[in-house]
Amino acid sequence: MQEHYQPAAIEPAAQKKWDDARISNVSEDASKPKYYCLSMFPYPSGKLHMGHVRNYTIGDVLSRFKLLNGFNVMQPMGWDAFGMPAENAAMKNNVAPAAWTYDNIEYMKTQLKSLGFAVDWEREVATCKPEYYRWEQWLFTKLFEKGIVYRKNGTVNWDPVDQTVLANEQVIDGRGWRSGALIEKREIPMYYFKITDYAEELLNDLDKLEHWPEQVKTMQRNWIGKSRGMTVRFAVSDDSKQGLEGDYAKFLQVYTTRPDTLMGATYVAVAAEHPLATAAAADKPELQAFIAECKAGSVAEADMATMEKKGVPTGRYVVNPLNGDKLEVWIANYVLWGYGDGAVMAVPAHDERDFEFAAKYNLPKKQVIAVGDNAFDANRWQEWYGDKENGVLVNSGDLDGLDFQTAFDAVAAKLQSQGAGEPKTQYRLRDWGISRQRYWGCPIPIVHCEKCGDVPVPADQLPVVLPENVVPDGMGSPLAKMPEFYETSCPCCGGAAKRETDTMDTFMESSWYFFRYMSPKFSDGMVSAESAKYWGAVDQYIGGIEHAILHLLYARFFTKLMRDEGLVNVDEPFERLLTQGMVVCETYYRENDKGGKDWINPADVELTFDDKGRPVSAVLKADGLPVVISGTEKMSKSKNNGVDPQELINAYGADTARLFMMFAAPPEQSLEWSDSGVEGAHRFLRRLWRTVYEYLKQGGAVKAFAGNQDGLSKELKDLRHKLHSTTAKVSDDYGRRQQFNTAIAAVMELLNQYDKTDTGSEQGRAVAQEVLEAAVRLLWPIVPHICETLWSELNGAKLWEAGWPTVDEAALVKSEIEVMVQVNGKLRGKITVAADASKADLEAAALANEGAVKFMEGKPAKKIIVVPGRLVNIVV
């Protein structure tokens, strides 16, 4: 055995050993319990970042722990390979997105392998490969035929200069990110998934997810947004019907969760696209201008929430069905046409947004809720409007004095009797629009035929292959300019037809990849029935909290779609979810001449610390001049505070990177990068290596202690007690608690006690062998390379076949225990007594303790309090 720890030598050797033994390559095995561990697959952006390292190390720790515990473990890996960044990089570098993506995959794959992850690379998938997205297209056609996928007009951000549709994140302050042009809203045909058909099941099944963080489930519940309310129809005033047709000429329909406040409505607001707005603007240029303004800018709901609320009156009126009041109709930029009915009733006295709008335009406010005897206070909406328990109606005629529920039911009865409304359950969730007017995505398998309409591509003609030798120019969709792609014949009539040139939202690929891993080479469907039955749901899923809503919701939705197609036999895709925290690091900058900030990498900064170790000043190493310390933030390119994992691996080895990531913080919390923490992790590994080296140097490996320990010295019994209590704790930390930092700390404490114990005797060496063999197995999930190497020196066998250390219950039973002795509540000594010592024996031993005698100062004991197994307190 080499004297010094050399990760550059031992890590490739350990990885080769695992690869040769194929320890990560699994198949269905009914003789073992299965464990499917999955970390969210990466986007192949070019290089791994520390967030990747943390995510995949957590997954590997859990996988290796289960492997040693006899499970048939599947830990696959793949690439979420479609998406906008590839198009942007392609335009920047004049290279096809496919070439850029495949190069990145190869490099990132070597990085992942260098970290020693126990990944079954034979299950690797890349979502941009036709053999993957073929089955996505197949499911799309099946769902289109069933009506779960449908086509309708949707609103998008249109860049009039680049002649292209922009994603919400590409719109910056209302302008295109590349052209700088003012963005317009456009209505174009798009494909949608009827996720709303599954809203109730998606909501209810959250209760099945016992091992998901409550925070994530709450976020999904809020996103689905089930509410009980009423549809209310305001009759259009006779003098306001001009230009309106059908039901729009009869009534304006709104949805409200607070029909009890209907008597407090003082105006109604409609979206710019509402037919009433269009009719009102027919002869009013000022309305036309405002509607045009509303149609410009982002369509993102988040932007709508924060922008300035604006509106114009239409001069049209509707009638409140409860009291006959005429309410003016306003066009408002905060009302969205695609949500609900595109109209809202406004109750300024009891809603903050309505109040601000009414105050801005001097509109009336009418109080209809009172809380106790308090006078109305416009600054307390949450109390007046949100409090459904304590408020009662006022200024509401015969409804006065009613509480929320009674008023709700009374209003519902009145409106229903008039045909002016009915109770309704509504969801915030909207159908999922999956059409993207971009190139680097999965083609939508639809053919447009003038005679037959929209025709799904037959299964035997799938996949519709995306051409890969395309370099986008940012000016519209490349596919729409490629007759060789879109010119085709209709599958129904054989006539000339045109392929759909939109591609799918990249959330589509990540909504089912976990099923494809089960049988990645299966050529007859999305997943083989045998594999789906064996692997079932993912047992452990790991990823960032930023995916709590959309990705996880769509994955749950797809699972139910695939279940209903008979493809899988589970209702939910992920049994247990761990959302790891971010990796954060200090940030530094200097202000530049343009008033902006030039961010400086932490590696280029030299710090000065105060006597408590806190940074007080920083200078740039290159010139010695000051830089601003800006606090810790998530590692990112924009703040230039990232640390390249490859540099860390090259300098310290993969095990040091893994150990630091697992020891620095609990997995669900943010991890603050620390160079000293990395160095500390490396020191511990050197110490572990040195401990085994020194042990073997003194006489080589022996048979580990097992059996009856009655003949051992007290010191060796104490060491075995520490070993087996540590094994029990670490097993719980890995399995139930998933707190890896405390598992590492427990092994460190074990080694501390080992160092203090005399193990020079024959029995001592046997116990030492037992301790060291257990320690390297306990640490193998986290630092597998060094542990694999040390195990081969200690045992000569294959660690992955050794199994998890078992707990010797006899070793946990101590014949003697140490008990604290207090006098008047202050620690004054310790006594060693038999573990089964009686209360009288404990009292006698405490009274005889030298420290107790000294501080009792000859006074008699008034009372003696005994806490069995812990302490004796003498009160004098």
Swiss-Prot record:
GO cellular component: cytosol
Residues reported to bind ATP: K637
Primary enzyme class: ligase
Motif ('KMSKS' region): 634-638
Matching NCBIfam families: leuS_bact
Short motif 'HIGH' region, span: 42-52
A GO molecular-function annotation: leucine-tRNA ligase activity
Protein family according to the UniProt entry: Belongs to the class-I aminoacyl-tRNA synthetase family.
Main location as per UniProt: cytoplasm
CDD domains xref list: Anticodon_Ia_Leu_BEm, LeuRS_core
Name of the coding gene: leuS
Keywords: Aminoacyl-tRNA synthetase, ATP-binding, Cytoplasm, Ligase, Nucleotide-binding, Protein biosynthesis
Pfam families: Anticodon_1, tRNA-synt_1, tRNA-synt_1_2, tRNA-synt_1g
Organism: Neisseria gonorrhoeae (strain NCCP11945)
Protein name per Swiss-Prot or TrEMBL: Leucine--tRNA ligase
Compartments, as annotated in UniProt: Cytoplasm
Entry EC number(s): 6.1.1.4
HAMAP family linked: Leu_tRNA_synth_B
Catalytic reaction equation(s): tRNA(Leu) + L-leucine + ATP = L-leucyl-tRNA(Leu) + AMP + diphosphate
Gene3D superfamilies found in the cross-reference section: 2.20.28.290, 3.10.20.590, HUPs (3.40.50.620), Isoleucyl-tRNA Synthetase, Domain 1 (1.10.730.10), Valyl/Leucyl/Isoleucyl-tRNA synthetase, editing domain (3.90.740.10)
A GO BP entry: leucyl-tRNA aminoacylation
